[in-house]
């Protein structure tokens, strides 16, 4: 039973790490493309900024969903019931 709990915690940690990595890479690409497009067409900067903030919110949702799934696995582990 301890191995299942340990494996679940390690899996949740890996899930959080990849979610944070994906969010960081997504924000880096998003910011770079926003600056590039604003420099190319400055008159569209306000429109692009609104769209950038919407996409940034969706990128943050990835990390929040990963936190929720990890908390589910850590505190309400569904795999322990399979051992009984």
Swiss-Prot record:
Write down the position(s) of the site called Reversibly protonated during proton transport: 60
Q: Tell me which UniProt keywords the record has, alphabetically.
A: ATP synthesis, Cell inner membrane, Cell membrane, CF(0), Hydrogen ion transport, Ion transport, Lipid-binding, Membrane, Transmembrane, Transmembrane helix, Transport
Question: A single GO CC term, please?
Answer: plasma membrane
Output the InterPro entries linked to this UniProt entry.
ATP_synth_csu_bac/chlpt (IPR005953), ATP_synth_F0_csu (IPR000454), ATP_synth_F0_csu_DDCD_BS (IPR020537), ATP_synth_F0_csu_sf (IPR038662), ATPase_proteolipid_c-like_dom (IPR002379), F/V-ATP_Csub_sf (IPR035921)
Q: Does the keyword Transmembrane helix apply?
A: yes
Transmembrane feature ranges: 9-29, 54-74
Predominant cellular place of this UniProt entry's protein: membrane
Q: What is its membrane topology?
A: Multi-pass membrane protein
Which domain of life, per UniProt? Bacteria
Q: Which GO terms describe its molecular function?
A: lipid binding; proton-transporting ATP synthase activity, rotational mechanism
Q: Where in the cell is it found?
A: Cell inner membrane
Report the sequence similarity comment from the record. Belongs to the ATPase C chain family.
Instruction: Give the multimer and partner information.
Output: F-type ATPases have 2 components, F(1) - the catalytic core - and F(0) - the membrane proton channel. F(1) has five subunits: alpha(3), beta(3), gamma(1), delta(1), epsilon(1). F(0) has three main subunits: a(1), b(2) and c(10-14). The alpha and beta chains form an alternating ring which encloses part of the gamma chain. F(1) is attached to F(0) by a central stalk formed by the gamma and epsilon chains, while a peripheral stalk is formed by the delta and b chains.
| The protein's role, per its UniProt record | F(1)F(0) ATP synthase produces ATP from ADP in the presence of a proton or sodium gradient. F-type ATPases consist of two structural domains, F(1) containing the extramembraneous catalytic core and F(0) containing the membrane proton channel, linked together by a central stalk and a peripheral stalk. During catalysis, ATP synthesis in the catalytic domain of F(1) is coupled via a rotary mechanism of the central stalk subunits to proton translocation.
Put simply, this protein is called ATP synthase subunit c
Show the taxonomic lineage.
Bacteria, Pseudomonadati, Pseudomonadota, Gammaproteobacteria, Pasteurellales
Encoding gene per record: atpE
């Amino acid at each position: 039973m301890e191995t299942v709990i340990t494996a679940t915690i390690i899996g949740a940690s890996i899930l959080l790490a990849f979610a944070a990595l994906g969010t960081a890479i997504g924000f880096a690409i998003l910011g770079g493309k926003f600056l590039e497009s604003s420099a190319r067409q400055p008159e569209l900067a306000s429109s692009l900024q609104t769209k950038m903030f919407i996409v940034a919110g969706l990128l943050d949702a990835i990390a929040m969903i990963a936190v929720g799934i990890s908390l589910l696995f850590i505190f309400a582990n569904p795999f322990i019931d399979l051992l009984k």
